[in-house]
């Protein structure tokens, strides 16, 4: 059975993608930010996914941190034997007008929304090359094309 790793799958679009892929027969590796609230949400998503008869596991990691991504990918590979699909879904917003935006607000959004894609594609891409198969989907936003007031950092990251 194929395995999909979805980043930011504890809520929103990521949760919906996890549930749909489970319905389609994929085993599901749910990544969530390592916090109690995100873990509780991820457990609810996992319960729904398991109702489709697939194997599901939670993998807490801050995907903006390369070392945490590396450990997560190793753990997913160990648990499921490989990774057939990666969905780069994790994303955050820290809205504010540019002249009032702190460098920390800007950097946090870029790290999660952009650097995480690099981290995951580099690590999972290597797994997929060794397997000689795999699929990667990276989510974007219309904000990356048109921008939104107060979302300079988010728009730049998408």
Residue ranges: model-predicted function:
Residues 99, 146-152:
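Active-site loop immediately N-terminal to the catalytic Tyr-X3-Lys motif
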Residues 97-98, 105-107:
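Substrate-binding pocket helix/loop in short-chain dehydrogenase/reductase
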Residues 121, 157:
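Active-site helix of classical SDR
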Residues 26-42:
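Conserved glycine-rich Rossmann-like NAD(P)H-binding loop of the short-chain dehydrogenase/reductase
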Residues 60-72, 103:
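The beta1-alpha1 cofactor-binding region of Rossmann-like NAD(H)/NADP(H)-dependent oxidoreductases
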């Amino acid at each position: 059975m194929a395995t999909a790793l979805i980043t930011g799958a504890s809520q929103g679009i990521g949760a919906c993608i996890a549930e749909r892929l489970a319905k389609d027969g994929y085993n599901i590796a749910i990544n969530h930010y390592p916090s109690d609230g995100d873990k509780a949400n991820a457990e609810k998503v996992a319960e729904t996914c398991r109702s489709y008869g697939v194997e599901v596991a939670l993998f807490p990691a801050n995907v903006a941190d390369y070392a945490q991504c590396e450990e997560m990918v190793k753990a997913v590979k160990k648990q499921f034997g490989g990774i057939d699909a990666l969905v780069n879904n994790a994303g955050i917003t820290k809205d504010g007008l540019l002249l009032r935006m702190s460098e920390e607000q800007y950097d946090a959004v870029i790290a999660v929304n952009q650097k995480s894609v690099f981290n995951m594609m580099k690590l999972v891409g290597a797994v997929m090359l060794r397997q000689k198969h795999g699929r990667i989907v990276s989510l974007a936003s219309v904000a990356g094309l048109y921008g939104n007031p107060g979302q300079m950092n988010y728009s730049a990251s998408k």
